Each structure stands twice: as C-alpha cells, then as structure tokens.
C-alpha cells in the first residue's frame, strides 16, 4: 500500500469547453451543448497542483505534485452529435515514505455527446466515453490505481439565463464511471456557472465532485473528493481565447488534496 491511492483525474478541457465566443450566446459550445455540424474546438491546457495524500497504513500524509500538458478537441459530426477526445503528458511525483515519479501519458479518452432534447433556454444531452491509461506498471506507487481502462456514461443539463443585463449559463452533469485494475467505480457530479461580463470577458465558477462506490479492498478503499475552481476567460477574437484559473480541494476522504493553477488556450474552427 503506497499511501498515495488512486488519484482522481478529469479533463481540464471541461473548464474550457464552455466557449463564449464573441457574438455567441452564453453556453453556446460544450458542456451540455453540442457543436454545430462541421465546427470544432481545440484546447491546449497546462495545469499543475501540489497536495497531500491521506495517512494510510500508519504512514504520515504523502507530499504529491502533478503537472499535465493536455490537448482536447471536439467536433460537430451533426448539429446533435459531437465527438470529443483528449490526451495528455503527465509528471506525477510522490514523496516519502514511498517516493516515486511517473513521467508519461496520462489517461486519454474518446467519446460522443448526443443532444437528447432542447428548448430555447434548456438543453439535455448524454455522453459515452472510454478512457485508456498511459501508465501500465500497477506496482509502481505513482501509477497504482491508474492502470486500468475505464468507461463512463454521463447526463448533462444546461440552461442559458440573464442576471440583470449579464448573460450567463449553468451546466450540471451527473456521470457513472466504471473502473478496472483495482479502484472502485465512481459517481461524478460537476457544476459550472458562467457569467459573460463583456463581449470578451467571462467568469466561470465550478465544482467537480467524485464519490466512489463502497469497497472492502484495503488497497483501494472508498474515497470522495470535491474540487472548486474559479477562472477567467478572455476572448482575443472570434477564434482565439485564453483562460487562467485557480483550484483547490474543499473536501477529501481517503484521497489527495489539490491546490493549483490552470492555463489554457482555446481555438475555435
């Protein structure tokens, strides 16, 4: 038992997937929304965090740090069907008592988002995603718990609104993720609220919560985590945007804490 445990992962492209481009309505792209046919979005993200793992097995908390360079792309196959995928290079380091470092590919994923129903303000969609691990040495402390294929089904609900004269959107997502190679399956609940203060400036407030299923495996016990993030997105023009965000865990049970920053560059095409 490493004292590190299966670390949570998620796509930081989700942070950038709500592209409020110049002249577009709030929440036009990503999240619960599908892309118009023949259009796409590319997001390059660099993020990093430091934190502590839980004190398992009588060991003290474990210092941890991680840096990822992530590429995410989504493309509208039809107005109601969007394909998306991502890959990332990862540096993940554990401190004593089991120091170990992993440098290589993080999880890569490929998925489809289908619009189920929409009105003028509301949109409902579903997603199916498969995750392929980059690490394959389950005995290495920095890879343990993150060497198995995973699959996920997700339901998304989005709504555009105005707060006074400020356009905004809210996106709520619920997912169930099947894990292999050790860790228990997981429920994911993500919430995003965005406000477009000017044609170029958007504020996003987000929460990413994961609650695993119960398990009797002492190596991979049940765990919970909730990460809050605030970020600003600035549209350079109708195709390019930049994003700066900060995030921190606000709740953890038998998994690591996180405190970090994220930088992203968006390109609509």
Describe the role of every protein-language-model region.
Residues 1-35:
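Cleavable N-terminal export/targeting peptides
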Residues 27-179, 188-269:
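Transmembrane beta-barrel domains of Gram-negative outer membranes and organellar outer membranes
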């Amino acid at each position: 038992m490493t004292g590190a445990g299966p670390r949570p992962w998620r796509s930081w492209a989700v942070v950038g997937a709500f592209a409020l481009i110049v002249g577009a309505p709030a929440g036009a792209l990503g999240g619960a929304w599908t892309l118009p046919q023949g259009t796409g979005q590319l997001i390059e993200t660099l993020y990093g965090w430091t934190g502590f793992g839980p004190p398992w097995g009588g060991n003290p908390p474990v210092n941890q740090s991680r840096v990822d360079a992530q590429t995410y792309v989504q493309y509208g196959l039809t107005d109601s069907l969007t394909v998306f995928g991502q890959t990332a290079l990862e540096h993940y380091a554990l401190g004593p008592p089991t120091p170990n470092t992993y440098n290589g590919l993080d999880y890569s994923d490929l998925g489809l988002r289908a619009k189920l129903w929409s009105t003028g303000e509301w949109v409902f969609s579903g997603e199916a995603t498969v995750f392929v691990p980059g690490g394959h040495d389950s005995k290495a402390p920095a890879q343990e718990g993150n060497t198995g294929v995973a699959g996920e089904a997700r339901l998304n609900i989005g709504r555009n609104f105005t707060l006074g004269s400020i356009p905004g959107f809210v996106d709520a997502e619920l997912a169930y993720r099947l894990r292999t190679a050790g860790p228990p399956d997981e429920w994911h609940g993500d919430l995003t609220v965005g406000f477009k203060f000017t044609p170029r400036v958007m504020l996003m407030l987000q929460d990413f919560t994961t609650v695993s299923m119960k398990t009797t495996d002492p190596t991979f016990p049940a765990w919970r985590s909730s990460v809050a993030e605030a970020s600003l997105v600035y549209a350079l023009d109708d195709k390019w945007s930049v994003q700066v965000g900060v995030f921190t865990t606000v709740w953890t049970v038998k998994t690591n804490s996180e405190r970090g920053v994220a930088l992203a560059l968006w390109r609509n095409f």
